[in-house]
Design a protein with these regions (language model features):
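Conserved beta-strand in the GNAT
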Residues: 53, 59-68, 81, 86
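Conserved GNAT acetyl-CoA-binding A-motif
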Residues: 101, 108-120
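Conserved GNAT-fold acetyl-CoA-binding loop/helix
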Residues: 18-41
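A conserved beta-turn-beta hairpin within the catalytic core of GNAT-like acetyltransferases
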Residues: 71-82, 92
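Conserved acetyl-CoA-binding loop-helix of GNAT-fold acetyltransferases
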Residues: 87, 93-106, 132-133
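Conserved beta-strand-loop-alpha-helix junction that forms the acyl-donor binding cleft
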Residues: 117-127, 145, 149
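A short helix-loop-beta-strand connector motif used in the catalytic cores of GNAT acetyltransferases and
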Residues: 41-53, 81
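A short beta-loop-alpha structural element at the N-terminal edge
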Residues: 4-17, 30
Length: 157
């Protein structure tokens, strides 16, 4: 396999990213494209966010999201969150997932992050081994998730 080009996504990558995210979360309700384009613009323009992509022959085939979060503890060192790791189904098992995650982590370390966090809802031990091969440990922290309460319809509506 030819080694991919690893870089930050651009506005021109929106459609390719949406196709990958459909593989990651097939049941997601699609948001209006204009809204998603505005979100990607915000990410692209920020120094604290990045959508990392791997491209082969110009096609986006893998991605992950990096969020560098300012912090008032740990001597002011920021920390990072890595999310939305997905490799196109035709390219899984080729090292592209590890490549985008390691690229994101390298950026986090260059930005002075003292740790990077990642959560997965997948229970498959192979997926856990994948994240461990990228440098993550499941033994250091316990993760919790809160979701907003269900929306209650207004009276008469």
């Amino acid at each position: 396999m030819t080694w991919p080009d690893l870089r930050h996504a651009t506005r021109d990558n929106l459609d390719a990213l949406l196709a990958l995210y459909a593989q990651l979360n097939p049941g997601d309700v699609a948001a209006p494209r204009e809204r998603l384009a505005a979100i990607l613009d915000r990410i692209v323009e920020s120094d604290e966010f990045a959508v990392v992509v791997a491209t082969l022959d110009g096609a986006v085939v893998a991605t992950c999201y990096l969020n560098v979060i300012p912090n008032l503890t740990r001597g002011g060192a920021p920390y990072a969150i890595v999310e939305n790791v997905v490799v196109d189904a035709a390219h899984r098992g080729t090292g592209l997932g590890q490549a985008v995650v390691r690229f994101a982590l390298a950026q986090a370390w260059r930005r002075g992050c003292y740790k990077a966090l990642l959560q997965t809802g997948v229970r498959d031990p192979a997926v856990h081994r994948f994240y461990e091969s990228c440098g993550f440990s499941a033994r250091e922290k316990t993760g919790f998730v809160a979701r907003p309460p269900a929306r209650i319809a207004p009276p008469g509506g």
